[in-house]
Amino acid sequence: MQLRPFGHQVRGPAGQGAVQHRAGGDVDLGGSAYSAGLEAPIKHSHDFRCWPGYGESVPAPRREDSSPVSPYIPLPAGLAEPRSSAAAVFDRIAGLYDQARPGYPPEAVTDLVRICGVGSSSRVLEIGCGTGQLTRDLAPNGARIVCVEVGSSLADAARANLGRWPNVEVVTTRFEDLDVPTSSFDLVVSATAFHWVDPEVSYAKAAALLDEQGKLALLTNAHSRGGTHIDERIAEPIRDLHRRLAPEVGDWDFPTAEDIQHRAQAGGDIASVWARVERRLSDPPPLEQLFGQPTVKTYPWLATYDRNAYLAMLSSQSSYALMDQVRHDELLASIGTLIDEKLAGTVTKEYVTVMAIAARAPG
């Protein structure tokens, strides 16, 4: 791949359902293609105010805290391999993904920029940009950003969202297949996407593409046990629904913010940290020769959803989007009814954003 000259304007096709993000985190759909299956506007807000311990390694405090959405889109036959299936389903729900997926706390982005020294002369590679959830916060710093996204619809949405920044380029390809010279970047970053890359390739290739002072940064929004989404009025009925309709999704049990922070801060190289954070069962590859010890930071925060936005957020996750339509729609309709009847149509959900940053090892 030849990297295009800096300053070339990247634009997606006009009128392809771009999403306008307003102050406070609300979203407004700009095209009917992005609201297919949604019978009411999706609105949500993210409370990124700093809880005690926000951005640090201390425990976070305990807190008390219309019609069903059916964005189901059938998948093509023959997708048996999990990575391929997930990539395909995200691409087929690109509009829903764009409007429903949360971004990242401003403090996390500020720390990322500060620790990695991101500025106008920086060269950044983002792996799995989605529709630009993190990119839109990095782009104003002026760094040259090459975004890799395997899904063509996701990439088109990212181009539409990021077209105002001439320093951003979106490339439709797998990271494994990206062909660029070694030592091309100062920062390789991936937000809630690195686990979809082949682990035999991910860390080694990221290290090879970094220059001598370069850094790898990984972020994710971990689901935690805080907010009314685990309120006793709805939690057990939702668990019963999952046991009956979606046993493959899980049992509606979430770790506490303290548990997530403890796993993140338990030491080891960046691959070990990330395997614990994402609760992966397989052993990560040893990275002694690739990266130094990571800096790890955590950011607990709270999101507030109306019922449609909450159901859309669930549907944007691969485990729900891969369900067959009948079970998917029954599950979401039942959860929506519980939210309406028990929580007056509004639900809060706690996340813990985890960020791990490691410098490329010398040599």
Predicted regions and their residues:
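Conserved beta-strand/loop positions that form the S-adenosyl-L-methionine
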Residues: 127
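A short SAM/SAH-binding and catalytic strip from SAM-dependent methyltransferases
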Residues: 186-200
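A short glycine-rich, Lys/Arg-flanked "PGG" loop and its adjoining helix->strand segment in the class I
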Residues: 201-212
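Conserved catalytic/acceptor-binding region of the Class I
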Residues: 212-300
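A short acidic, Gly/Pro-enriched loop at the edge of an enzyme's catalytic core
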Residues: 177-187
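Class I SAM-dependent methyltransferase SAM/SAH-binding core
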Residues: 123, 131-177
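Conserved class I S-adenosyl-L-methionine
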Residues: 59-119
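Conserved Class I S-adenosyl-L-methionine
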Residues: 267-363
